[in-house]
Regions:
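Specific register positions within alpha-helical solenoid repeats of the TPR/Sel1-like families, i.e.
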Residues: 44, 104, 128, 156, ...
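Alpha-helical adaptor scaffolds
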Residues: 245-313
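Short solvent-exposed coil/turn linkers within tandem alpha-helical repeat scaffolds
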Residues: 80, 126-129, 171-181, 209-236, ...
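Alpha-helical linker/edge segments of TPR/alpha-solenoid repeat scaffolds
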Residues: 143-150, 190-206, 227-244, 302-306, ...
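Residue signature of alpha-solenoid helical repeat architecture, marking inter-repeat boundaries
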Residues: 61, 88-90, 142, 179, ...
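The canonical Cys-X-X-Cys-His
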Residues: 119-131
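Extracytoplasmic c-type cytochrome modules immediately beyond a signal peptide or single-pass transmembrane anchor
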Residues: 20-118, 132-232
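Helix-turn-helix repeat elements of alpha-solenoid scaffolds
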Residues: 121-124, 157-169, 198-202, 263-277, ...
């Protein structure tokens, strides 16, 4: 897990569409999170710093502030909670903060750090789901100690997409970050497919990157594959509202199919998940459709390479298990989820899964398969 320190925690960007009255109330609640988030940034980016006893009081104080201010969102008017997925997102993050804070106070700092890595995931997941009305810039809220990659992650999480693209492009031109080209390129594609959604503009940008001839051969081949996907997207007809789930499923299935080079179609997977998100946001799905949609998101994100949607697969797979226990989709979701977690904690010395995470896996397994399928407790 120590190699996954690029994600930075921030919740500022959970906003509602501008069409909803009094959106300023939600934004005002989010403003309270700025100070504790900025303080925690370098600590959440470095597990050693987070677990250092010298930082314990500081972390405790900021977690208390985050929990208090985020729980205030649970008291917003019903009209906000009626938005598809919003109340669920608030509840998930509130529970995450409660759990991480409790474990941290118990001295289980590594587990608390691991749990808090989900914060930026949940944040950008909301951006991918809801219609964010605008972008903005608030450079003062970025810690000076962050390197360009960490800075870009924070900018993406706080919906400062224009600045994020500039930061990522600059890092791509810097030879000292050549080892991170795959992360940078995937972050750029993520912005293009999930935020900008202009395949012609994206084609021009990535063709320009290829022309620079700075990319390693493997990365250049990856971008070449994206160009094909973007080209197909630019020629695809608009998808009707009622067909988004079905079209999204087709794209996900096609994107997950490995070709002769064993590569998934990243553009198709990202397009497909965008359509599934939109179908969930629109509402009107019956239980079977919603169950399929949530599972498809978890499955699709598990098929995407690392640094695209780190943690998104766990988010939706776990949601599928929690909302639809003892169903076929829940069982599929658990199998993917458990494999992912085991991979995260397996290295050259074997597997070393923390006890708390093992208990969490066991809880999910019982929900996915049903208590009756397990031996009774002694």
């Amino acid at each position: 897990m120590k190699n996954k320190n690029l994600l930075l925690a921030t919740l500022l960007s959970l906003t509602l569409p501008a069409a909803i009255p009094s959106a300023e109330e939600v934004q005002s609640s989010m403003q309270k999170l700025l100070v504790p988030l900025r303080t925690l940034q370098p600590l959440l980016a470095n597990e050693d710093k987070f677990t250092d006893s010298d930082n314990q009081d500081k972390i405790h104080e900021q977690l208390v502030a985050l929990r208090r201010d985020f729980h205030s969102l649970e008291r917003i008017p019903t009209k906000y909670r009626s938005q598809p997925g919003f109340e669920e997102s608030v509840k998930n993050v509130a529970e995450l903060l409660d759990d991480a804070s409790r474990r941290f106070n118990e001295g289980r700092k590594e587990y608390a750090w691991w749990r808090l890595q989900r914060l930026p995931t949940d944040c950008f997941s909301c951006h991918a789901t809801y219609k964010v009305s605008s972008q903005y810039s608030n450079a003062a809220m970025i810690d000076d100690s962050l390197n360009p990659l960490e800075r870009a992650r924070f900018l993406m999480a706080t919906r400062q997409f224009t600045e994020a693209k500039k930061t990522l492009t600059a890092a791509l031109d810097d030879d000292s970050y050549r080892l991170y080209d795959d992360q940078i390129l995937r972050s750029l594609l993520l912005i293009e497919t999930r935020i900008s959604k202009d395949p012609k503009e994206s084609l021009a940008m990535f063709k320009g990157i290829l022309k620079s001839e700075k990319l390693p051969l493997d990365d250049a081949n990856t971008v070449q594959g994206w160009l094909k996907g973007l080209e197909a997207w630019s020629k695809a007809p608009a998808v009707a509202e009622g067909n988004k789930l079905a079209t999204g499923e087709k794209l996900i299935r096609a994107g997950a199919t490995r070709g002769i080079d064993f590569r998934p179609d990243d553009v198709a997977l990202l397009r497909g998940t965008a359509l599934v998100h939109e179908s969930l946001e629109a509402g009107g799905l019956n239980e079977a459709q919603r169950r399929k949609a949530i599972y498809l998101l978890g499955y699709a994100y598990s098929q995407l390479p690392q640094f695209f949607t780190e943690g998104w697969d766990e988010l939706y797979l776990e949601k599928c298990i929690e909302e639809f226990p003892n169903t076929q989709e829940a069982k599929w979701a658990y199998n993917i989820y458990s494999d992912k977690v085991m991979d995260d904690f397996t290295g050259s010395g074997g597997s070393n899964v923390p006890a708390e995470i093992k208990l969490h896996l066991e809880d999910l397994r019982k929900k996915a398969y049903g208590e009756k399928e397990f031996a009774p407790k002694a």
